Amino acid sequence: MNWTILNVSIPVHDLNKSKEFYEMLLGVREKQEELYQPLFQNEESVFLGDKGFGLRLFKPKPDLLIADNIQSRRSFVTLLVESIENIKRNLEVKNIKFKINDCKNDKSIKGIFVQEPSLNLIHLVENKNGFNEDLNGWNMGLDWGIHHMNLESLNVRDSIDFFCDIIGMKEGKWIAPVNKGDFSIDPSELAILPLSNNNRGLHVIKPDDGFGYRNNFAHNPSIGGHPAFTIKDLSSLKARLDKEKILYSDAKVYAMPG
């Protein structure tokens, strides 16, 4: 199954303040076109990117107000895949519940929402216009791209089996730098579904409560899931964060060669 990361969605409390923050990180783009938006209304989300690729910020609603719809209270990923029908059949065979849009008109996008075994919400969208797994932000004229999405899993192997057996993805091997940080790359604790040879793709990790402490980080990247972005000038970003007195962890080259 060919696939790539189309976008990531992050729940936020204040859309305007969050938009300002992410524009500081990724830059401002005035003209942008958003596709593949079956769940959120415009006034409830902000999209940074173009033609469906990018970052969506959304404000969760009270659960009792969304009727038969679904939402996530943590960040989730949208994957572009070459065939929804194959995935749908695999889900039905395993009796895994999912939500699929019904494509009532020509503008509808065929997509599925499903939870993998650790209950991470996964959005799968079919690409009707030919497939290019190298799709990333610079293809859309952006100055940034999505490097990976990190998914927290209490059973890494169960999650990987889901992505491989149900979605049709292929597991890879973690490529560590010479000066790797203090964390496990045992496939039962950290596994990768790669899009490249530099660890771009989906990372599935078992939460490690000592991760931040052992690596002298201000935060713990193994808990809760997160997106990682590729930008052109990390030094300038660090200077902006310092100026705004925003706390960050300088990870250097601890997990991936580069």
Descriptions of predicted regions:
Residues 1, 4-13, 33-34, 44-53, 65-143, 151, ...:
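Vicinal oxygen chelate
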Residues 1-2, 9-55, 152-201, 243:
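Core segments of cupin and vicinal oxygen chelate
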Residues 33, 62-67, 130-136, 179-181, ...:
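A short, acidic/glycine-rich surface segment
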Residues 56-58, 113, 123, 203:
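Conserved beta-strand in the GNAT
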Residues 60-62, 83, 104-105, 129, ...:
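Short beta->alpha connector loops
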